[in-house]
């Protein structure tokens, strides 16, 4: 048999549940990479992960590397042979070291001259001998920033290791990993089956743990099992609210999921639903239940890791904790309602936003001004925008947000309603944090969008203004995410705003002069770079982006309209020829820039029908295209310009631009310049060629 299954299991103390799936994926990927590097073929890889183990099963792993032919370089030809082409001592010595005769040596030309070399057949090594080093190398590559050491071991790992399985087929791979000798024994559930379980062959691993150890080893299967059990248990009361992040975490906490249903005091339903959900999620990792109308019910789902002989006791324990936590939340909420958002403004002055940029109170006042400025540009109520901007950060100093930071904005929404602030202001306080991540929903109304953009613009200007732009993968102030949020809001909400004007306004709102005098330009370039990355993710060709960028639009919505117009233009049959013609025009004009003294076209200097035809078509199309340009109907404008293909082709076929007659030459250059300007006001089509 030339292949066997290979099994690795690392048994340890409970792994971090939020990182378990990521660790499992990383281990599988690094082992795959190392096997490929060693030129060991295999069919596929399965990964397993539970709180107490990380495992990888490799199916049909080759038992030996393939035989390889390697080249070994020797001395130069000059050193290897004398004038009579007789092998020298150096040549004999090299041949002897390779185990061949001098007649079997070959000559190869390189950049450094001619050298002799020998082809050696290298037999492949046994997989059994290679595996220990392969696994060691894979483990070193695991993303474990908080690895720990235990006992008197020198080895580091995420958690202390208690056992290791290394099996190739039915054979043990003799090795010591992470301070433990490899064996063929795994362990079952910590409480239900703590004894060792003998694994006779790798393919039995998952089944043995399930039937003997009460462990569902496959992370994905366990997660879907938990989902199904939660939904089934909740269906008796209503419908479970399943947070995918919490489901992932709970899957990383249990090996044998058991579902129980508990309840809390109905009086707590008077609290905002987000408070109830967050309390249950953060403190007890439980799932809420709602009715058909979406209202919360006084029940929750517990995912336990044991089949208790007295499940009621487990439920009562969880209920006691949940009720106590909800009582705390109710206390925080009632306390917070005693102080209005506006009266919290002075307390924001005690919270530093950034040492060089002042406090959160300073930031709130800057957002107030910038939100009003944006509101004026898009013709909505400036006073409401200013009010929402001023109060946008006030809930950050509330007791509830201090306890649950993820409720920022949400609590501000409820407190604003309690303070009888306008509904739009309350919504803006909640929604100005949107979008929180890639693909997240956007603010629903324009007032919220104003505050959201103002907040992000202020942050970008401030941080870049003190020369702390993101570098590499370091972005502590999440400026890249802020830039993408601005772009998505402006483009998807169809808000036409001059980005450069916004940045300058934000810069002027800072009470102190920012150290970076070029902050507005650098911030603009930073945001446009995020726009480029966004389009690349949407598979917009880089050439299309560069073509539009060449026209320097400062309005992201306008930029997007041009992108779509150029993409449509590329579908036209005339597109390639026009792009090539524009490139030709661009090259001619670059070389003859000094001769472009006059932009006026003199028809009396034409001496061919081709010149008249192109000039007449340009004049006819220019008026129509310029009107479409003013309406920002770029798609139709470029479609109209496509009709110039024929007169442009005829012009280049019949007319010599660089003639000796200076007047005619300059006149023809002026004609080409007019053609270029007509196209380039939308995008530089020549860059598509």
UniProtKB/Swiss-Prot annotation:
Molecular function (Gene Ontology), one example: glycine-tRNA ligase activity
Record keyword Aminoacyl-tRNA synthetase present: yes
Biological process terms in GO annotation: arginyl-tRNA aminoacylation; glycyl-tRNA aminoacylation
Subcellular location: Cytoplasm
E.C. designation(s): 6.1.1.14
Alphabetically ordered keywords of this record: Aminoacyl-tRNA synthetase, ATP-binding, Cytoplasm, Ligase, Nucleotide-binding, Protein biosynthesis
Main localization (coarse): cytoplasm
GO cellular component: cytosol
A Pfam entry, by short name: DALR_1
Catalytic function, reaction form: tRNA(Gly) + glycine + ATP = glycyl-tRNA(Gly) + AMP + diphosphate
Name of the top EC class for this enzyme: ligase
PANTHER family: GLYCINE--TRNA LIGASE, CHLOROPLASTIC_MITOCHONDRIAL 2 (PTHR30075:SF2), GLYCYL-TRNA SYNTHETASE (PTHR30075)
Family membership: Belongs to the class-II aminoacyl-tRNA synthetase family.
Subunit comment: Tetramer of two alpha and two beta subunits.
Protein name as annotated: Glycine--tRNA ligase beta subunit
């Amino acid at each position: 048999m030339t292949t066997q299954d290979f099994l690795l299991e690392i048994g340890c103390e409970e792994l971090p549940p939020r990182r378990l799936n990521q660790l499992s994926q990383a281990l599988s990927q690094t082992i795959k990479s190392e096997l490929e590097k060693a030129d060991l073929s295999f069919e596929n890889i399965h990964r397993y992960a539970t709180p107490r183990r990380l495992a990888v099963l490799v199916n049909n792993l080759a038992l030996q590397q393939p035989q390889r032919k390697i080249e070994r370089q020797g001395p130069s030809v000059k050193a290897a042979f004398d004038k009579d082409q007789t092998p020298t001592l150096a040549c004999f010595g090299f041949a002897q070291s390779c185990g061949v005769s001098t007649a079997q040596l070959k000559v190869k030309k390189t950049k450094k001259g001619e050298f002799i070399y020998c082809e050696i057949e290298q037999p492949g090594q046994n997989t059994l001998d290679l595996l220990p080093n392969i696994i060691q190398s894979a483990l070193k590559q695991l993303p474990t920033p908080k690895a720990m050491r235990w006992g008197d071991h020198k080895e580091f790992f995420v958690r202390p290791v208690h056992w290791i399985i290394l099996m190739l087929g039915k054979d043990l791979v003799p090795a010591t990993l992470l301070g433990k000798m490899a064996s063929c024994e795994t362990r079952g559930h910590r409480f239900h089956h703590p004894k060792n379980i003998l694994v006779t062959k790798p393919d039995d691993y998952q089944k043995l743990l399930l039937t003997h150890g009460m462990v569902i080893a496959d992370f994905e299967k366990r997660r879907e099992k938990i989902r199904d059990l939660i939904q089934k248990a909740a269906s008796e009361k209503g419908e479970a609210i399943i947070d995918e992040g919490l489901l992932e975490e709970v899957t990383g906490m249990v090996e044998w999921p058991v579902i129980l249903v508990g309840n809390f005091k109905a009086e707590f339903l008077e609290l905002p639903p987000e408070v109830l959900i967050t309390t249950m999620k953060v403190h007890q990792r439980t799932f809420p239940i709602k009715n058909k109308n979406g209202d919360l019910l006084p029940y929750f789902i517990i995912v336990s890791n044991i089949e208790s002989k007295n499940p009621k006791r487990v439920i009562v324990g969880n209920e006691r904790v949940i009720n106590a936590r909800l009582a705390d939340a109710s206390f925080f909420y009632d306390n917070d309602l005693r102080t209005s958002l506006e009266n919290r403004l002075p307390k924001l002055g005690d919270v530093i936003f950034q040492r060089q940029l002042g406090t959160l109170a300073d930031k709130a006042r800057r957002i107030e001004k910038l939100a009003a400025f944006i509101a004026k540009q898009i013709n909505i109520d400036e006073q409401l925008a200013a009010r929402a901007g001023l109060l946008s950060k006030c809930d950050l100093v509330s007791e509830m947000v201090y306890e649950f930071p993820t409720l920022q904005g949400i609590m501000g929404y409820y407190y604003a309603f309690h303070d009888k602030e306008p509904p739009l202001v309350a919504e803006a306080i909640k929604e100005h944090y949107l979008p929180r991540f890639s693909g997240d929903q956007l603010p629903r109304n324009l007032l919220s969008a104003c505050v959201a953009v103002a907040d992000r613009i202020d942050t970008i200007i401030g941080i870049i203004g003190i020369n702390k732009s993101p570098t590499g993968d370091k972005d502590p102030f999440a400026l890249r995410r802020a830039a993408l949020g601005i772009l998505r809001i402006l483009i998807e909400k169809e808000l036409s705003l001059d980005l450069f004007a916004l940045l300058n306004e934000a810069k002027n709102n800072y009470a102190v002069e920012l150290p970076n005098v070029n902050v507005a330009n650098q911030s603009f370039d930073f945001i446009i770079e995020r726009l480029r990355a966004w389009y690349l993710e949407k598979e917009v060709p880089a050439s299309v982006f560069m073509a539009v960028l060449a026209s320097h639009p400062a309005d992201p919505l306008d930029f997007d309209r041009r992108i779509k117009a150029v993409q449509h233009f590329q579908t036209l049959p005339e597109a390639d020829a026009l792009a090539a013609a524009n490139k030709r025009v661009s090259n001619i004009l670059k070389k003859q820039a000094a001769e472009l003294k006059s932009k006026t076209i003199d028809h009396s200097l034409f001496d061919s029908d081709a010149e008249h035809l192109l000039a007449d078509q340009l004049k006819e199309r220019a008026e129509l295209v310029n009107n479409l340009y003013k309406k920002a109907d770029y798609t139709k404008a470029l479609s109209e310009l496509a009709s110039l293909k024929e007169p442009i082709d005829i012009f280049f076929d019949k007319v010599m631009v660089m003639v000796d007659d200076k007047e005619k030459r300059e006149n023809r250059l002026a004609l080409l310049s007019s053609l270029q300007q007509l196209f380039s006001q939308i995008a530089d089509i020549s860059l598509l060629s």
